[in-house]
């Protein structure tokens, strides 16, 4: 029993360390993004941020599920994508990118209010998520809330000057 408890505690501790390393790296990249001198530089930094966002910090199976959902979404299999993203959210409700992907698929399904609810979850977890901020602009435009859409795009631009 002691061995099982030790393994469980070790797993929780190491997962926490990986998440902290991930956050530190993302924080560093956002500093670099704000000071990028041109679009090409910003794009390289943005790609690194997306790589970190779409890779679960400690659970490879969730990264794979997210990728499977993304593939389904790209193939216009929106119900299958929605199910994959929901499964990821159920397994880790604190992973912003799972909420962001589901918000995207909900937008593509025309379920704008539900998409906005998921975007709210993303931004609660990661307020600098420029993908969610621009997605929010699209959702608010679809809902004819034009000032909210403009505000979302302005916020995205503050976070990502070359967006």
Language model features with spans:
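Register position in tetratricopeptide repeats
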Residues: 55, 74, 108, 142-143
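Helix-start (N-cap) detector for alpha-helical repeat units in TPR-like alpha-solenoids
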Residues: 62, 96-97, 130-131
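Canonical positions in the second alpha-helix
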Residues: 88, 121-122, 155-156
